[in-house]
Amino acid sequence: MIISRGSHVDEEPVAKKPRISVGEMTDDTTDDGLNTEEIRAPYTTEEMDEPEKAALLPKIPKKSPVSIGMNPENGKYVLPNYSKDESLNARKFLKYYGLRKFLDTYLPEELNSLYIYSLIKLLGFEIRDKELLSSLYRFFHPVKSSDQFKLEYEDFTDPLEKKEAVKLIKDLQKAINRVLATRIRLSNFYTIDHFVSKIKKAERILVLTGAGVSTSLGIPDFRSSEGFYSKIQHLGLDDPQDVFNYDIFMQDPSVFYNIAHMILPPENMYSPLHSFIKMLQDKGKLLRNYTQNIDNLESYAGIDPEKLVQCHGSFATASCVTCHWQIPGEKIFSNIRSMELPLCPYCYQKRREYFPNTGDEEYDTLKGNLESGIQNNNFALKSYGVLKPDITFFGEALPSKFHKTIREDIMKCDLLICIGTSLKVAPVSEIVNMIPAYVPQVLINKDPVKHAEFDIELLGFCDDVATVVAQKCEWDIPHKDWEGKLKKKRFDVNEIERGVFNIEAGSPE
């Protein structure tokens, strides 16, 4: 049994290279309909200088890197041992030259399924099917450094069954799609000095922010052990994220308004990190700030509306879910603090027809009627005339501004800085994989983001890292704490591994 040039299996004596259909088994289309394949950026650009291009270009192998020999003494096969550099080069080759040339270069013309498995390993992956893995290793010879025997590289029969070979082809498809969808770190951008030099020269910086930029103000993040979702587990919801589920809100808005006070943002406050972004704007360097936060603190810091994309909406405004009348968000803050349903004045009389015994202060009665409505399946009544903050719930589309700007911005930016985010929610989390490969990417976060490949990771409190960067750039952050507390504050900066630094406040002199 052999692997044919298509994805099916033939009973012929010689195998040919498989035709892999990239995208057939991929997750590139996000939940919000943003197809990263359609807007994937070029690998290099003519604007790059030669050292920058050289850092991205792969080496062309002198011979087929994937070669499998057989030990004639026991009939078992020997897999090559691939180094990290060989794996990195294979990934670069695939991304730069494309799939067809990659397969032509890395696989011999005649092959069997063991070559497919070896190529998966070369790309840095392992198959998860334990049964298939067990079948494979029955045919491999464990090689020790002291072993000396001559291998045969002539054609040999594929040891795997047809269904196992098909599984391997599908796993190779997944590995290829993952490589194409994930960036590769730049080899010439890995120190803080590199970052400082780049941020000084950059003219179109894309900043992506998450909850970590606001935690210093007492606003909880969402997914950490001390975050918001952990604090509401006592509510007994199947999923803590249900408090932001649009369908559940429409069925029973009290689920959200029982906890909304916990995430209500402070007014007219912002962190040094917010001011750091404002500083980039003032210096003409900020292309756009895409924030996943709903606290609207960027506006308090002075980020211009045209420079700000609130990907998940914000508390800045609130709208009636029935007639869509909109008001400034602070108009319902008192209701939120009192855990009351804010009601639209234009829909109020009609709502009283549905709930005739409900006064403004009779929240318990209203809640009881809402629960009764749920039991009776009268979904149109429960949220009738309720004002909802204009934050994007699960089940709602992202604001149109996100889609209008992101396609242009990812092609324009010359530096990406991700700050205070775990990059867990699509499609915003996909931005890092859509940026051109030659654009440096920097993470500023308390914890590493293991599923992304940043060139430089600055781990610590966001305000501390922003202060260190500003100090090294000899820039002043426009924040009330800068002159008195931050400008001369000392920090300990330790390199954990190449490109990864831990930053902590140092001991006072």
From Swiss-Prot:
Disulfide bonds, paired cysteine numbers: none
Annotated binding of Zn(2+), by residue: C320, C323, C344, C347
Enzyme class: transferase
Cofactor note: Binds 1 zinc ion per subunit.
Cellular compartment(s): Nucleus
GO process annotations (BP): negative regulation of meiotic nuclear division; negative regulation of mitotic recombination; regulation of thiamine biosynthetic process; silent mating-type cassette heterochromatin formation
Reactions that this protein is recorded to catalyse: N(6)-acetyl-L-lysyl-[protein] + NAD(+) + H2O = 2''-O-acetyl-ADP-D-ribose + nicotinamide + L-lysyl-[protein]
Acidic residues: compositionally biased ranges: 25-35
Required cofactor names: Zn(2+)
Gene Ontology CC terms: Set3 complex
Domain Deacetylase sirtuin-type per the UniProt entry, residue ranges: 185-476
Gene Ontology MF term list: histone deacetylase activity; histone H4K16 deacetylase activity, NAD-dependent; metal ion binding; NAD+ binding
Family according to the record: Belongs to the sirtuin family. Class I subfamily.
Name this protein carries in UniProt: NAD-dependent histone deacetylase SIR2
